[in-house]
């Protein structure tokens, strides 16, 4: 059996090391502690690690304290009042169960849905379609407007997957249906917490959206999407692809002569061929010898690499389908006691109180939308050039009737904590006074050109930080065909559409001209589209009593830099460029201890102003401000009240 050899720990005792390690102080303390222990007659005069840690950190020593026995259990409760249908209010009573209540999550199942059957149109007819757009099925020989002659144009009907549909057929097609983005966030329009008729806190779906944009860490986003009904892309790969590898320092070429910044010529060395052949061995072996012998250095400049392409696709609730299956949602509540177990409410301190969670549900039209289930196919043969053909598609989008979505399994899961009777009695007998953080929200409409300023009259109490966004009214308008995608975005959203043709060729007789209109082409039925969110605030300012706290800062400073610098792992930089953050605390959301605030209850002249090139009399918007406000919760006489109400 081998034994370890002797070793020495060599410490550099330079000036910096003396400050960082304080080795002289450590040696002196050890000696002093030994002398003191000897003077007291202790059999073991050596110091303890806890004594050493009074002045020095010991990284290899772990600590623990005994803890008060505690257990927890999730308890399901059904609605106390309210009809469980979309658009209604549900009220859940918090039962007297356990000693504390902490986490809460709502569970709902949205029933399956589909659109109604519709008749295929007759060629030459027109009908008013979705979002006020006239739909026309042109006659052959005419352009899309059904009035301008277009020689060689032939029209047929197809479904979204290119399958033909006979014009005039009864019950020939159905529109597809899909859910809005993050339906779990939109489902809860408003959530309120009441004790004995007093509202202690409430928040809207805008607050939930901003919390997700700024506070849900990236490593938990996939799980969060599963909970709130947002589809997650799946990864696919292609087969093996052969690639040529290029190296500018090719071994078979002479050494190139380059000129540096001082106009001095210098000779460059080429890459070692043996080095390259080790990394790209595909042309260094044949099929028979691959993997059986050492790689042979080569002098050929062509190195090969075999790779795969990665593709992403989605098939979740936001993907249009003829039949949307039932959708289960798990929606976490966002009150102060839900976020931090240290602030769990002692249920035993409110033995006779009425504790309720009231939830206002969104309507069905805000959650589901239709996708056109019928398209008009234009196939045009160019007269005199029979080899040229262009194929284009346009949707025939007539709204159907979406089946009513049922709402089942309406439950509120409450995390109840249990402690020993001795600890239980302490909370029953004593008055509890704790610092809490509640939501204060203000939504203000604006239609002023270029510049506007709003008084934050709905904000009060000490404010630690604010999430701010200017949301175009168009984003939630029924006339917006993409409002189910845009509803949560704080900016103007435009569509970027890929080039419509995915096949193009030049006929043999047109090869000499090679003009764009000489090509045959086939467009996609539904071209690839991706949204681009454009921030609509250029500069933002915050003033209190006429004093500029933030003076025309660019919006990117508040949307990117502030959340990047502050908050540690508790705050992230949002993907939405229009979502902004302003903080008055040094460590927002990082720790329970406050680290800065502005008391807007005293500074009532509290304004937010901004510059914009988007907002006007037609392109209106709503300013959304969600603030974290400090208050104090007083538990006494069987009830819970806020210390400050104004």
From Swiss-Prot:
It is a peripheral membrane protein. Induction: Expressed in the late phase of the viral replicative cycle. Disulfide bonds: none annotated. It is found in: Virion; Host endoplasmic reticulum membrane; Host cytoplasm, Host cytosol. One of its GO terms (biological process) is symbiont entry into host cell. Keywords: Capsid protein, Host cytoplasm, Host endoplasmic reticulum, Host membrane, Host-virus interaction, Late protein, Membrane, Viral attachment to host cell, Virion, Virus entry into host cell. InterPro entries: MCP_C, MCP_C_sf, VP_dsDNA_II. One of its GO terms (cellular component) is host cell endoplasmic reticulum membrane. One of its GO terms (molecular function) is structural molecule activity. Belongs to the NCLDV major capsid protein family. Homotrimer. The membrane-bound form, but not the cytosolic one, assembles into large complexes. Interacts with the minor capsid proteins M1249L and p17; these interactions form a rigid zipper structure that stabilizes the capsomers. This is Major capsid protein.
């Amino acid at each position: 059996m081998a034994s370890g050899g002797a070793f020495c720990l060599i410490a550099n005792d330079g000036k910096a090391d003396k400050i960082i390690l304080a080795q002289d102080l450590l040696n002196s303390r050890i000696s002093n502690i030994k002398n003191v222990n000897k003077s007291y007659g202790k059999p073991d005069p050596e110091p303890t690690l806890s004594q050493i840690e009074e002045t020095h950190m010991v990284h290899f020593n772990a600590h623990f304290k005994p803890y008060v026995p505690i257990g927890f259990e999730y308890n399901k409760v059904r609605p106390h009042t309210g009809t469980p249908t979309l658009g209604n209010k549900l009220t859940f009573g918090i039962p007297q169960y356990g000693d504390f209540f902490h986490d809460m999550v709502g569970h709902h199942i949205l029933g399956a849905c589909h659109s109604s059957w519709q008749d295929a149109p007759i060629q030459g007819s027109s009908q008013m379609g979705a979002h006020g757009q006239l739909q026309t099925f042109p006659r052959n020989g005419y352009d899309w407007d059904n009035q301008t002659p277009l020689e060689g144009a032939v029209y047929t009907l197809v479904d979204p997957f290119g399958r033909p549909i006979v014009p005039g057929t009864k019950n020939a097609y159905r529109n597809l249906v899909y859910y809005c983005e993050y339906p779990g966030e939109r489902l809860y329009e408003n959530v309120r917490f009441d004790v004995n008729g007093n509202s202690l806190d409430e928040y809207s779906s805008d607050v939930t959206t901003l919390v997700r944009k700024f506070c849900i860490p990236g490593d938990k986003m996939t799980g969060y999407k599963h909970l709130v009904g947002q589809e997650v892309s799946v990864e696919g790969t292609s087969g093996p692809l052969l690639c040529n590898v290029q190296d500018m320092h090719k071994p078979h070429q002479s050494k190139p002569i380059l000129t540096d910044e001082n106009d001095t010529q210098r000779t460059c060395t080429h890459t070692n061929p043996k080095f390259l052949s080790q990394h790209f061995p595909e042309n260094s072996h044949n099929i028979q010898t691959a993997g059986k012998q050492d790689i042979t250095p080569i002098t050929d400049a062509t190195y090969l690499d075999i790779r795969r392409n990665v593709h992403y696709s989605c098939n979740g609730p936001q993907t249009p389908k003829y039949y949307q299956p039932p959708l289960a949602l798990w929606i976490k509540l966002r009150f102060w006691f839900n976020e931090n177990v240290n602030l769990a409410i002692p249920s035993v301190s409110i033995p006779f109180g009425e504790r309720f969670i009231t939830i206002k549900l969104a309507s069905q039209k805000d959650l589901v939308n239709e996708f056109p289930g019928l398209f008009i196919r234009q196939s045009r043969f160019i007269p005199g050039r029979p080899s040229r053909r262009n194929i284009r598609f346009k949707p025939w989008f007539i709204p159907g009737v979406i089946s009513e979505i049922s709402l089942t399994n309406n439950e509120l899961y409450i995390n109840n904590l249990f402690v020993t009777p001795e600890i239980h009695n302490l909370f029953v007998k004593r008055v509890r006074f704790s610092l809490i953080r509640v939501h204060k929200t203000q939504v203000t409409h604006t239609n002023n050109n270029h510049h506007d300023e709003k008084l934050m009259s709905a904000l009060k109490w000490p404010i630690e930080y604010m999430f701010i966004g200017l949301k175009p009214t168009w984003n939630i308008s029924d006339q917006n065909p993409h409002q189910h995608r845009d509803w949560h975005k704080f900016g103007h959203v435009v569509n970027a559409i890929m080039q419509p043709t995915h096949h193009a060729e030049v006929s043999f007789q047109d090869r000499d001209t090679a003009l764009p209109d000489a090509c045959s082409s086939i467009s996609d039925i539904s071209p690839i589209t991706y949204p681009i969110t454009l921030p609509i605030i250029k500069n933002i300012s915050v003033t209190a009593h006429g004093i500029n706290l933030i003076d025309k800062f660019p919006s990117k400073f508040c949307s990117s830099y502030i959340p990047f610098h502050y908050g540690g792992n508790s705050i992230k930089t949002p993907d939405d460029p229009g979502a902004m953050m302003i903080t008055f605390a040094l460590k927002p959301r990082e720790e329970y201890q406050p680290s800065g605030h502005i008391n807007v209850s005293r500074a009532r002249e509290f304004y937010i102003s901004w510059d914009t090139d988007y907002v006007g009399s037609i392109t209106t918007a709503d300013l959304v401000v969600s603030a974290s406000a400090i208050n104090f919760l007083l538990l006494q006489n069987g009830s819970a009240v806020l210390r400050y109400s104004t």
